[in-house]
């Protein structure tokens, strides 16, 4: 079974990683976890024109590394097979695209991200992933 965990560094995404680890520990057979973070670079494109070459990319990479650091540390302790994926662009589109190209069986993600303007009950990224995914999506 291949599992894709979409994270953004929020408390909800940390809960998603913990849930996935508990779920996979209870399963037998071949299991693999891929933890993915997507850096939404749409609002930073304008800055690329006015900043030194590579500075926006460096910022996005640092942010991605911060998002993944906790998950790496946590999953290393579990001894579960895992890898990390960093993508750039629209988060929901990249999550759906990766779920298809990676032949995943399930997506696990938090219901709300880090944005302060998220929807009341469920975040906009989670809504779009649930609406467009061809595989089961578990929201934590």
Name each model feature, range by range:
Residues 1-2, 140:
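Absolute protein N-terminus
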Residues 2-53:
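Small/aliphatic-rich secondary-structure junction motif
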Residues 8, 89, 111-114:
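Histidine-centered beta-alpha loop that forms part of the nucleotide-sugar donor binding/catalytic region
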Residues 21, 69-76:
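Class I S-adenosyl-L-methionine
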Residues 73-107:
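Structural beta-alpha unit
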Residues 97-140:
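Gly/Ser-rich helix-loop-strand patches that form or flank binding pockets
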């Amino acid at each position: 079974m291949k599992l894709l965990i979409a994270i953004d560094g929020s408390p909800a995404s940390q809960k998603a990683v913990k849930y996935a680890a508990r779920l996979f520990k209870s399963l037998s057979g071949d299991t693999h976890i891929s933890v993915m973070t997507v850096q939404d670079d749409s609002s930073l494109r304008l800055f690329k024109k006015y900043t030194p070459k590579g500075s926006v990319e460096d910022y996005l990479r640092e942010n991605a590394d911060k998002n993944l650091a906790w998950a790496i540390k946590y999953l290393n302790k579990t001894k579960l097979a895992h890898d990390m994926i960093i993508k750039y662009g629209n988060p929901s589109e990249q999550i759906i695209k990766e779920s298809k190209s990676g032949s995943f069986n399930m997506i696990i993600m938090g219901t709300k991200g880090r944005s302060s303007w998220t929807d009341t009950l469920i975040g906009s990224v989670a809504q779009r992933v649930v609406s467009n995914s061809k595989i089961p999506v578990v929201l934590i």
